[in-house]
From Swiss-Prot:
Catalyzes the isomerization between 2-isopropylmalate and 3-isopropylmalate, via the formation of 2-isopropylmaleate. Heterodimer of LeuC and LeuD. The keyword Iron-sulfur applies. This is 3-isopropylmalate dehydratase large subunit.
Length: 472
């Protein structure tokens, strides 16, 4: 009998029963809730006169709609200017109180983006199944979890039953071998992967990221890569449990205590792919050949490295790709063949569930070296992913490095990743962003998003245009 993949082991450990149609009933260990996708789910519970099946499995925090400007944030929910956004946060507060679900409220020191808060609090542990009404739930797969986003109706199902009906995906392994060069980060790795396989490359698969690059990568770096598995077409991205995983989890507030630790660790260490496991698809990439990446268009697969130029139509692999590029040239206000380093920028955003952890902020701060944000930059903001990240950064003096350089130091939240709160781009503005999506209008109507690493974003802020952080 062939060995099992990491995905197989996680699936089998949580499969309650197989169904006649080929689907399975899967038990869910951890359910993360926020203000946008939960109101109708709670309403459904109430109308059916149901209560959450397992209260302790649920944790909530507002993140999408919260203001990041300190003055507005100090007013709490009342500081949210948009009526709909304010109502969503108030509704989350009310529902959590009504159903007795634990919540890190807007100005709780533990509040933040759920995909940052979950791991840092130890709420997400190796071997778990984790769901949230948000597509970037794949982030948690970095801890050796089966984690994916769900819709609002499924949020209600999990609240009511702690289970979901799912169909098993195929297994894909993406191996990145060798060592990364100086100035190349986990964000560059995942952008390079998406550039290679496309945004549909992982469709129908659960992706396991493996190889020397991932073995050497920090836990926060792994989270960045798994976060963008969805941009590669997969609902699920994961990395096997190893010493890095165990060391990260130990001592977290919700992690097992000392008396339970040995047993928990022994169980967690079973979550890896067996040597003889068979994958439906295997892709290999030489990590030593990856350079800092920049997205130029309106899809995460429209990516080149910093030394290259916007591709020309004759480079397209088919007519559909050429049509997409032609539309992207127009929307982005770029010319085919234009050097990436010639793209002038208006705003800089360092944050999001992809790149707002302490290592990300350290990477960005290290680039500043006493320099100032370019006069041509209208706004450069740094938004920590959680209250705990913000406090740690301030304890290390990173906030002062940013503000002295001309960045704004904001309060935790999803911020400019998506145009759902007050942090938005104006039409035709170019933004170097550490977020995960560059679709048309993602950061504001007519806004032009370029996906980069925190270090590349910081360097771009200082130069006013994209530069190669390796030589900056």
């Amino acid at each position: 009998m062939a060995g099992q993949t990491l995905y197989d082991k996680l699936w089998n450990a949580h499969e309650v029963t197989k169904r006649d149609d080929g689907s399975s009933l899967i038990y869910i260990d951890r359910h993360l809730l926020h203000e946008v996708t939960s109101p109708q789910a709670f309403e459904g519970l109430e109308l059916a006169n149901r209560a959450p099946w397992r209260l302790s499995a649920n944790i909530a925090s507002p993140d999408h709609n919260v203001p990041t400007v300190t003055k507005e944030r100090s007013e709490g929910v009342a500081g949210i200017k948009d009526k709909v956004s304010r109502l969503q946060v108030l509704t989350l507060d009310d529902n959590c109180a009504k159903f007795d679900i634990a919540e890190f409220t807007i100005n709780d020191a533990r509040q933040g983006i759920l995909h940052v808060v979950g791991p840092e609090q130890g709420l997400v542990l190796p071997g778990m199944t984790v769901v949230c009404g948000d597509s970037h739930t794949a982030t948690h797969g970095a801890l050796g979890c089966l984690a994916h986003g769900i819709g609002t109706s499924e949020v209600e199902h999990v609240l009511a039953t702690q289970c979901l009906i799912q169909k098993k995906s195929k297994n894909m392994q993406i191996r990145v071998t060798g060592e990364l060069g100086a100035g190349v980060t986990s964000k560059d790795v995942v952008l390079a992967i998406i550039a290679k396989i496309g945004t549909a490359g992982g469709t129908g698969h659960a992706i396991e990221f493996a190889g020397q690059v991932f073995e050497d990568m920090s836990m926060e770096g792994r989270m960045t890569v798994c976060n963008m598995a969805i941009e590669a077409g997969a609902r699920v991205g994961m990395v096997a449990v190893d010493d890095t995983t165990i060391d990260y989890v130990k001592g977290r507030p919700y992690a097992p205590n000392e008396s339970q630790w040995q047993q928990a660790e022994a169980y967690w260490r079973t979550f890896y792919s067996d040597d003889d496991a068979v994958f439906d698809s295997v892709i290999e990439i030489d990590g030593s050949q990856i350079a800092p990446q920049v997205s130029w268009g309106t899809s995460p697969e429209m990516v080149v490295d910093i030394t290259q130029s916007v591709p020309t139509p004759d480079q397209a692999i088919d007519e559909a790709q050429e049509e997409g590029w032609l539309r992207a040239y127009t929307y982005m206000g770029l010319e085919a063949g234009q050097k990436i380093t010639d793209i002038q920028l208006d705003r800089i955003f360092i944050g999001s569930c992809t790149n707002s952890r302490i290592e990300d902020l350290r990477d960005a701060a290290a680039v500043i070296k006493g320099r100032k944000v370019a006069d041509t930059i209208k706004e450069a903001i740094v938004v920590a992913g959680s209250g705990q990240v913000k406090l740690q950064a301030e304890a290390e003096g990173l906030d002062a490095l940013f503000t002295d350089a001309g960045f704004e130091w904001r309060e935790p939240g999803c911020s400019m990743c998506l145009a759902m709160n007050a942090d938005k781009l104006e039409p035709q503005e170019h933004c170097a962003s550490t977020s995960n999506r560059n679709f048309e209008g993602r950061q504001g109507n007519g806004g032009r998003t370029h996906l980069v690493s925190p270090a590349m974003a910081a360097a771009a802020a200082l130069a006013g245009h994209f530069v190669d952080v390796r030589t900056f």
